Amino acid sequence: MAEEPGVWSLLERAPIDWTEPWLIGLAAFHILCFIVTYISFKSYPLQICHFLLMVVLVSCAEYINEFAAMHWRAYSKQQYFDSSGMFISLAFSAPLLCNTIIIVVHWVYKTLCVMTELKTLQQKRKESREKRKKKE
């Protein structure tokens, strides 16, 4: 029985030249986005701006795909941008959407923490009122 090919061997066999400068730049852009996502956990305004920027970029992916399909010879050795938008969806939009999901999960976690803290304070306040009533 043949062994399943790994992700790396699939990437090597794909008809994509990963050494093209613009693909390396795209990978660097996504790494930078992940770093900013991590850093933005400490700054809520930065996180909101970063989130909105990524959402806008994903929503503009169709237009970027059309532009890239028309001008691919200027920066690439092959045409990656087809009418279905599969390449741009996987190489551009998917990593950005992963970042936005990470941010949304972080927001849900922070909201749950605040709700838990609020409920704890409400319980303490209720207990202190009951203690005061018993003393009176």
Curated annotation (Swiss-Prot):
Membrane topology: Multi-pass membrane protein
Coiled coil: 112-136
Record Pfam families: TMEM18
Signal sequence interval, chain numbering: none
Perinuclear space side: 1-20, 65-84
InterPro entries, sorted: TMEM18 (IPR026721)
Gene Ontology MF terms in the entry: DNA binding
UniProt keywords, alphabetically: Coiled coil, DNA-binding, Membrane, Nucleus, Transmembrane, Transmembrane helix
The organism's place on the tree of life at top rank: Eukaryota
Family statement: Belongs to the TMEM18 family.
UniProt cross-references to PANTHER family, sorted A to Z: TRANSMEMBRANE PROTEIN 18
UniProt protein name: Transmembrane protein 18
Organism: Xenopus laevis
